[in-house]
UniProtKB/Swiss-Prot annotation:
Domain of life: Bacteria
Name of this chain's protein: Large ribosomal subunit protein uL14
PROSITE patterns cross-referenced by the UniProt entry: RIBOSOMAL_L14
Gene that this sequence comes from: rplN
Native source species: Chlamydia pneumoniae (Chlamydophila pneumoniae)
Family matches, as InterPro entries: Ribosomal_uL14, Ribosomal_uL14_bac-type, Ribosomal_uL14_CS, Ribosomal_uL14_sf
A cellular component annotation (GO) from this entry: cytosolic large ribosomal subunit
Amino acid sequence: MIQQESQLKVADNTGAKKVKCFKVLGGSRRRYATVGDVIVCSVRDVEPNSSIKKGDVIKAVIVRTRRHITRKDGSTLKFDTNSCVIIDDKGNPKGTRIFGPVAREIRDRGFIKISSLAPEVI
């Protein structure tokens, strides 16, 4: 579960390393986000010479959470980190590579490009 002030790692090659969530999109008073949800973030840490600068406000989709995901068949899944992928306004990833596995729920939510770029879909 991701909420306001949560810090996430960035799992793509856009140049941002860490972001801080300050809004969960989808509803007037929505508090928590999970895998596949879109959040609005502020960039907190960047690599040198990257196109994204510190303090930029961006949209991102969550691809991994430490909180377990319960699937319809009863199985659960959780990851070691809270991670996201930076997207543009149309929902396409800004980066050209994605690092680490992503959950299958990403494809179910309509982010097919992200799931195809990922090295492993769990």
